[in-house]
Every structure is written in C-alpha cells, then in structure tokens.
C-alpha cells in the first residue's frame, strides 16, 4: 500500500433528528454528521410503527384523500 494517499480517520459525532447522538470514526473532517433516523428511533429497531413525515407529505396526502368515502359507504 502506498503511504500518504488515504484520508485521515477522525473521531466523529453523529447527531440524529430524535436527539440521540453517538461517536464513531469517519473520514469527514468536520467531526459531525447529522442524520434523520438512527437505530434508536427507526421502527425496525424499536419495534414501534410510526410515520416518518418529511416535509409534511403524509399530512398533505391525508388532507387530500384521507376523508373520502368509498363506493360501499355511499
């Protein structure tokens, strides 16, 4: 392996949207990474089902289509 061609590997803090944080190592020089979902709030790991609404898309969908009656209800 050639020496001097690999980036530095620094200690990095990962900050989640849920407020959790943990420390890992990365080549990103800022020392901080921001993520929307981590293992402490992801439904697969927590066993809870919740809707992750980014940008209000789910609310907009429910506003448009959520209260419509089906043909069987008429």
Swiss-Prot record:
Subunit text: Part of the 50S ribosomal subunit.
Main function: Binds the 23S rRNA.
Entry binding sites for Zn(2+): 16, 18, 38, 41
The keyword Methyltransferase belongs to this UniProt entry's keyword annotation: no
PROSITE patterns listed in its UniProt record: RIBOSOMAL_L31
Keyword set, alphabetical order: Metal-binding, Ribonucleoprotein, Ribosomal protein, RNA-binding, rRNA-binding, Zinc
Cofactor binding description: Binds 1 zinc ion per subunit.
Name recorded for this polypeptide: Large ribosomal subunit protein bL31
Family annotation (InterPro entries): Ribosomal_bL28/bL31-like_sf, Ribosomal_bL31, Ribosomal_bL31_A, Ribosomal_bL31_sf
GO molecular function, one term: metal ion binding
Organism domain of life: Bacteria
HAMAP family named among the record's database cross-references: Ribosomal_bL31_1
Cofactor(s) needed by this chain: Zn(2+)
Family named by the database record: Belongs to the bacterial ribosomal protein bL31 family. Type A subfamily.
GO terms for cellular component: ribonucleoprotein complex; ribosome
Gene Ontology biological process terms, A to Z: translation
């Amino acid at each position: 392996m050639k020496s001097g061609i690999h980036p530095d590997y620094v200690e990095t803090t990962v900050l989640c949207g849920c407020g959790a944080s943990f420390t890992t190592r990365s080549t990103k020089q800022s020392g901080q990474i921001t993520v929307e979902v981590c293992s402490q709030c992801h439904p697969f790991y927590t066993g809870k089902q919740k809707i992750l609404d980014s940008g209000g898309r789910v609310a907009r969908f429910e506003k448009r289509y959520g209260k419509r009656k089906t043909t069987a209800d008429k």
